[in-house]
Design a protein with these regions (language model features):
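Beta-strand-rich domains and repeat architectures in extracellular enzymes and scaffolds
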Residues: 45-81
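Predominantly five- to eight-bladed beta-propeller fold
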Residues: 24-29, 81, 164-214, 219, ...
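Conserved beta-propeller blade repeats
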Residues: 13, 50-65, 100-118, 137, ...
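C-terminal motif of bacterial Sec signal peptides marking the signal peptidase cleavage site
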Residues: 15-17
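Multi-bladed beta-propeller domains
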Residues: 26-52, 78, 86-102, 130-146, ...
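Bacterial signal peptide processing site
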Residues: 19-21
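Short glycine/acidic-enriched loop and turn motifs that connect beta-strands
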Residues: 71-75, 121-124, 166-169
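Sec-dependent N-terminal signal peptides
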Residues: 4-12
Length: 255
């Protein structure tokens, strides 16, 4: 019994240390060494020091540009995505989020006073908002599953978001509970695999919810319960395939 308690204590300490490490900002060093500069070669090591520029969003008055950059730390074998804003007139750049969590998909509100974005700082990918200067971040959604993309209507009172929905059982262990250790998959139609991705019976669906001062309310699956198709379309799941109408009362999407 004493050994059991000792094992549990060591495990908890280890998990706590891992969690603390993940909450610390990821160290990013993108400076080139003297050897790399002298060689003048675009080596794999040099390429990994380069930031990957992601989604961009122009402010309503066209004076500021939001965009993301993903940086990598080779020693820790992980990366982090941060949000930046650039002043169109001066070219001045400010980093709005730090390297302690992934922050992506930034969008301006209608008057340019707030920024909506996705962040995993709460432990899963959820919708957040912050001031145009990056101050006062606030979590808007608190859903059980990750949100993969979203869009706020022009009026700022509705939001669509995309989540994976388990629609069908593909694993034999799900179909036959008495075969819990079975690793087989069961299919009766194509396609069961695309590139390196198996069809696991989960599909991306669009949900629409109210957006109030209290956050995001319960969403409604507009694709339909049990619908075995993705929107946006696989394999890229591009959020540009979903758009609010200018009056904010209708949603256009592909499926």
């Amino acid at each position: 019994m004493k050994n059991l308690f000792l094992f549990m204590a060591i495990t908890l300490v280890g998990l706590g240390g891992c969690s603390e490490k993940r909450s610390q900002p990821l160290a990013i060093d993108n400076s080139l060494t003297q050897e790399e500069i002298a060689a003048g070669v675009l080596s794999p090591e040099v390429m990994w020091k380069m930031g990957r520029v992601g989604l961009a969003s122009l402010s309503p008055d066209a004076s500021r540009l939001l965009y993301t950059v993903t940086w990598y730390n080779m020693q820790e074998n992980r990366g982090v995505t941060a949000i930046y804003v650039r002043d169109a007139a001066s070219g001045e750049v400010a980093q709005l989020t730090d390297f302690s969590s992934n922050n992506s998909d930034p969008k301006w509100n209608a008057d340019g006073s707030k920024i909506y974005f996705l962040s995993d700082r709460s432990g899963s990918s959820q919708i957040w908002e912050m001031g145009a200067d990056g101050q006062n971040p606030r979590q808007l959604s608190k859903l059980e599953k990750d949100i993969e993309g979203f869009g706020v209507n022009p009026a700022g009172d509705k939001v669509f978001y995309v989540q994976g929905v388990q629609v069908a059982d593909r694993k034999s262990s799900d179909i036959h509970p008495d075969m819990a250790e079975s690793k087989a998959r069961v299919y009766d139609d194509l396609m069961c695999r695309h590139w390196d991705r198996w069809d696991e019976g989960e599909y991306r669906h669009i949900f629409i919810a109210d957006l109030t001062s209290g956050g995001i309310g319960k969403g409604v699956d507009i694709i339909g319960e049990g619908a075995e198709w993705d929107t946006p379309l696989a394999p890229y799941f591009d959020m540009s395939e979903i758009a609010w109408a200018p009056d904010g009362t209708r949603l256009a999407y592909t499926c």
